[in-house]
Amino acid sequence: VTTLKQVTIFCDGSSLGNGQQSQRAAAVALLGYKGYWRAVGEYLGRATNQQAEIAAAAVGLESLRQPCQVNVFTDSRYVVETMNGRFRRKTNLPWWERLDRAAGPHKVHWEWTRGHVGHLVQEAADKAARGIAAAGHVDPIILRDAVDKVGTVDDTAID
C-alpha cells in the first residue's frame, strides 16, 4: 500500500481594481511538506477576486508532481463551500473546471481560514498575490520573500 504524501497548501488571490478597466489579478499558493515551503504564482490580468481565489487553489494543486493528500486552506468561503458541494456553480465555470482538473488526482480537504488576522502563512500568500498583481507579472523575488517569511513553519501542526 502506497501512502500519499501529506501536503499543506495556503492559497490566496488578489484583484486590484476589481471591476475596473485597469484590473490586475494574481494567484499565489504556498505549499508545505515536512516543514519545507515553496511558493507558486500566476499573473491573471483581468480577473475578479472570486476568479483569482479559484485560480490560487488551482495553481497550488497543479504544481504537485504526484497524487497527494492535500489540506487546502483559503480565506475564500466561496471556494471552500463550492468545492465541498454546498454552493451551486452558476458562474465562473471555466475557472471551476480548471480547479476540478487540478484537484482530480489528489485527495483534497478544503478548509476555510479567516484572512487578515495575522496567520503567518496566509498573510504571506496574500502579500505575494497583491505584489504580483501590482507588478503585472510573476516576480520570483516576491515568491522567494513569501517563502522566507514563512521559514520552516511546521505544516504538519497546522489545523
Which residues does each predicted region cover?
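Amphipathic, alpha-helical segments enriched in basic
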Residues: 31, 35-39, 47, 74, ...
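RNase H catalytic domain
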Residues: 8-23, 57-126, 133, 137, ...
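RNase H-like nuclease fold core
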Residues: 1-51, 62-68, 158-159
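Acidic two-metal-ion nuclease catalytic site recognized across multiple nuclease folds
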Residues: 136-159
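Flexible, glycine- and charge-enriched loops at secondary-structure boundaries
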Residues: 46-50, 54, 89-92
